[in-house]
A protein has these predicted regions:
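Sec-dependent signal peptide recognition
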Residues: 1-7
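Hydrophobic h-region of N-terminal signal peptides that target proteins for export
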Residues: 7-16
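Binuclear metal-dependent hydrolase catalytic cores
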Residues: 16-194, 272-295
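Cap/insert and terminal regions of metallo-dependent hydrolase folds
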Residues: 12, 183, 189-192, 200-292
Length: 295
């Protein structure tokens, strides 16, 4: 234990404060109350994004003091973004993430971490906005020529990003037959946070999540699932997690807080979803909503 303490002392800033927010709690379904899947980890004044679904930059802005929030930063401070997998509900905000902070004055390149296909997506977005980028740089707008660029880092099973504030480890989860789909274990000096990503029950997730302070896990409505046609039931059972399965997972991991997010409601309410999971798990459960501060 003493050895571990000194190891953490040299790795992390032990005076750091970690804040965790839900930016977007939604799914592919166009729910006007829920943005595309995205989360924010703040360590001191450094933001780290997990996924970037539709509305990511605007929801990020909603947490800043400029727009009535409590964070003394702005969108130009976004430097690192990590992607769990390439599905559209997790990536539709990428063009916003590349372009908008630059328009607002960002000069440093974005650090994109994700499956190798993300690199091609980002290149294609920049190509698609070539006219707008050239107009802003070479027209009368006093715009810099660097802030829309990005550096790419490929994520794989076991990938680790680490600096003096944070350690992020990627692990392969079980999202149907999608080979490059990951969950993340994020460790700071004061928190261990696990993001399930989109997944059916995953033994690797359970192994990686031991000792987690916060487990952010996807789930679907039990009642809604029973109303689905057999073909959709087969699909969702292979790609996602039921309340009973999540209860079993949480009972094994025993996180200090279980956050239900990326919820396939299928007509259920937030309280009904919480009750469905609470039938199988009696720990601290919170239902994610956009701009929720988890910690």
């Amino acid at each position: 234990m003493i050895r571990l303490f000194f190891l953490l002392f040299f790795i992390f800033d032990l005076g750091a404060e970690t804040k965790v927010f839900v930016l977007g709690s939604g799914t592919p379904n166009p729910d006007p109350e829920r943005g595309g899947s995205s989360y924010l980890i703040m360590v001191n004044k450094t933001p780290y994004l997990i996924d970037f679904g539709a509305g990511v930059v605007r929801n990020f802005a909603g947490l800043t003091s400029e727009w009535g929030g409590n964070l003394e930063i702005d969108t130009t401070s976004i430097e690192h973004a990590f992607l769990t997998h390439m599905h559209s509900d997790h990536t539709l905000g990428l063009s916003d993430l590349i372009i908008t902070p630059w328009i607002m004055g960002k000069t440093e390149s974005l650090k994109l971490h994700g499956p190798k296909e993300l690199d091609l997506m980002a290149k294609n977005i920049i190509d698609a906005y070539d006219f707008d980028i050239n107009y802003r740089i070479n027209g009368t707008q006093p715009q810099n020529s660097t802030g829309y660029k990005y550096d790419f880092f490929e994520i794989y099973d076991g990938y680790v990003y680490q600096n003096e504030e944070i350690r992020l480890e990627a692990f392969k989860n079980s999202h149907g037959d999608l080979e490059k789909s990951f969950g993340f274990v994020v460790t700071t000096s004061d928190l261990k946070i696990v993001f399930s990503g989109d997944t059916a029950p995953s033994e690797k997730l359970i192994k990686k999540s031991k000792g987690a302070d916060i487990l952010i896990h996807e789930v679907f409505s039990e009642a809604g699932f029973l109303k689905k046609t057999p073909d959709w039931q087969i699909y969702h059972a292979a790609h996602h997690t039921s309340p009973e399965q999540l209860g079993s997972i949480a009972n094994t991991i025993k996180p200090k807080k279980l956050v239900l997010s990326h919820i396939l409601y299928w007509g259920a309410t937030e309280s009904q979803i919480k009750m469905e999971v609470a039938k199988y798990y009696d720990g601290d459960i919170e239902v994610a909503t956009d701009l929720l501060r988890i910690h």
